[in-house]
C-alpha cells in the first residue's frame, strides 16, 4: 500500500511516504503563516532533495506544494494515488480510545477534546481537513498517542479527585508516546525471538519529552504521563511530578496568572530550569567543565527515571527487559549507565563496552550475566502509524 504519514503542527507539517512499508520520501513544511516558509521533500532512496521557498499562508497551501514536489520528483503521481493517509493525533480523549478511520464524528470529537491538547489537536485537525480537500478519495486514519494506554486499569488511570471530575469532565490519566511504546515493545519481542504475549517490558522513551511505560504481554498497564504530557519524568523544559500545592503558592508569591504558571511548568522548568540547558549534549559538556547545576540537573533526571522504572517492577508480575528509546535513550550512554547502575540490585548488569558503542540499530547492552535484558531500540513512530493505517484500511 502507498501510505502518507502526516504530523501536523501549528506552523509545520512533517511527512513520510511509505510504499509497501519502505520509506521512499520524507520532508517538512515549515514556518506556515510566515513570509519565509519552506517546503523540503527528500527522496530517501537516492538522497535527492526538492525544495521551495515562498509564502505559505495555511496548511492547505503547504500540502498543495508537497503534492507538486511529489510530482516533480516522480515519486508519486498525485496525492489521489495514495491508498491512505495516517495522521498522528496527540489526544483522543475518553471516547476516541482506539485508532480509527476518520469520519464526521471523529473530526468533531478531535475538535471537542482540543481543550486537552490546545497546542496540538487543532493543528492535527487542520492537517486532516487539508488532506480530505486535497485528495477526497483517499482514506484518512487518526492514530492517537493516547490509544495504546487504553488498556490501563481504572485504579491506574484515575486521579483521587471527586468522581464527578472524571464522570462529567473526563479528567483522568491518558498517557502519551503510545505509538512509540507500542512500536519498541513489539520490536523487542522480535529481537528477543519471543511472542509479545509472553513478554513484560519497561519502555523508557527519553527525548525532550520523556515517559516510561509498564507493558505486560503487549499491553500498557501504567505510564508516567497523565492528563497531559506534563506529568511524570523530569524533561527538557517540563517539570514532571511536583506537589500541586506549589502552584497556588507560586501564583501568590510571583503574582502569576494560570497561563503564566502553565508556561512556567511546560517551557521554563525541567533540566532547563535547573541549569539553563535542555540539550543533554550541552549538559554533559557543562558537567565536564565543572558546572554543578548541570550535574544536579542530570542527577535529578536520572533519579526520577530510576524511581519510575523501579516502581514498574512492582506493577508488572515479572520484568523481562528494559528498553531505552528516543533521542536520549538511543544516544546517551551516560544516562543509560547511571540508570542501570542504580537498578543493579534488581538483577540488571550493564555491559559497559556495549553501552558505549555508538552504533545505530537495535542492540542489547546488558552483560551476559544480567538477569534482565537491556535493549536500545530506535523508535519509528511514522512506520508504526503507517502499519496501523494499513491495518485499518484492510479491515474496511
From Swiss-Prot:
GO cellular component, one term: cytoplasm
Residues that, per the record, bind substrate: 88
Positions of the catalytic residues: 145
The keyword Cell membrane appears for this protein: no
Cofactor binding note of this UniProt entry: Mg(2+). Can also accept Mn(2+).
Co-factor(s): Mg(2+); Mn(2+)
Signal sequence, renumbered to the chain: none
Record localization: Cytoplasm
Any matching Pfam family: Acetate_kinase
Keywords, sorted A to Z: ATP-binding, Cytoplasm, Kinase, Magnesium, Metal-binding, Nucleotide-binding, Transferase
Broad class of where this protein is predominantly found: cytoplasm
Superkingdom of origin organism: Bacteria
EC number, UniProt record: 2.7.2.1
HAMAP family for this protein: Acetate_kinase
Subunit structure: Homodimer.
Name of the molecule in the record: Acetate kinase
Lineage: Bacteria, Pseudomonadati, Campylobacterota, Epsilonproteobacteria, Campylobacterales
GN (gene name): ackA
Amino acid at each position: 500500500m502507498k501510505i502518507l504519514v502526516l504530523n501536523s503542527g501549528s506552523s509545520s507539517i512533517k511527512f513520510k511516504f511509505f510504499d509497501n512499508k519502505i520509506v521512499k520520501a520524507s520532508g517538512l513544511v515549515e514556518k506556515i503563516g510566515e513570509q519565509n516558509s519552506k517546503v523540503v521533500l527528500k527522496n530517501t532512496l537516492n538522497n535527492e532533495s526538492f525544495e521551495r521557498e515562498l509564502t505559505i499562508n495555511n496548511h492547505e497551501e503547504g500540502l498543495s506544494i508537497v503534492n507538486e514536489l511529489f510530482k516533480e520528483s516522480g515519486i508519486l503521481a498525485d496525492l489521489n494515488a495514495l491508498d491512505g493517509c495516517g495522521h498522528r493525533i496527540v489526544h483522543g480523549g475518553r471516547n476516541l480510545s482506539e485508532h480509527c478511520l476518520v469520519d464526521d464524528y471523529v473530526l468533531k470529537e478531535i475538535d471537542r477534546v482540543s481543550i486537552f491538547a490546545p497546542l496540538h489537536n487543532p493543528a492535527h485537525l487542520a492537517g486532516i481537513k487539508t488532506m480530505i480537500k486535497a485528495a477526497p478519495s483517499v482514506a484518512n486514519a487518526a492514530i492517537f498517542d493516547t490509544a495504546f494506554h487504553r488498556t490501563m486499569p481504572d485504579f491506574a488511570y484515575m486521579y483521587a479527585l471527586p468522581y464527578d471530575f472524571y464522570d462529567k469532565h473526563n479528567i483522568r490519566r491518558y498517557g502519551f508516546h503510545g505509538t512509540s511504546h507500542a512500536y519498541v515493545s513489539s520490536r523487542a519481542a522480535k529481537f528477543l525471538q519471543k511472542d509479545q504475549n509472553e513478554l513484560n517490558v519497561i519502555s523508557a522513551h527519553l527525548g525532550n519529552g520523556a515517559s516510561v511505560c509498564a507493558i505486560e504481554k503487549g499491553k500498557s498497564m501504567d505510564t508516567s504521563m497523565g492528563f497531559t504530557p506534563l506529568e511524570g519524568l523530569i524533561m527538557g523544559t517540563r517539570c514532571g511530578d511536583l506537589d500541586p500545592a506549589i502552584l497556588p503558592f507560586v501564583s501568590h508569591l510571583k503574582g502569576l496568572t494560570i497561563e503564566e504558571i502553565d508556561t512556567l511548568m511546560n517551557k521554563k522548568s525541567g533540566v532547563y530550569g535547573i541549569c539553563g540547558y535542555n540539550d543533554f549534549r550541552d549538559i554533559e559538556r557543562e558537567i565536564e567543565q565543572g558546572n554543578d547545576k548541570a550535574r544536579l540537573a542530570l542527577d535529578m533526571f536520572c533519579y526520577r527515571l530510576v524511581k519510575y522504572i523501579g516502581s514498574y517492577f512492582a506493577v508488572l508480575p515479572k520484568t523481562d527487559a528494559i528498553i531505552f528509546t528516543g533521542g536520549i535513550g538511543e544516544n546517551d550512554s551516560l544516562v543509560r549507565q547511571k540508570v542501570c547502575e542504580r537498578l543493579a540490585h534488581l538483577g540488571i548488569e550493564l555491559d559497559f563496552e556495549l553501552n558505549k558503542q555508538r552504533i545505530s540499530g537495535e542492540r542489547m547492552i546488558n552483560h551476559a550475566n544480567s538477569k534482565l535484558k537491556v535493549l536500545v531500540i530506535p523508535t519509528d513512530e511514522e512506520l508504526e502509524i503507517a502499519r496501523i493505517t494499513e491495518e485499518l484500511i484492510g479491515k474496511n
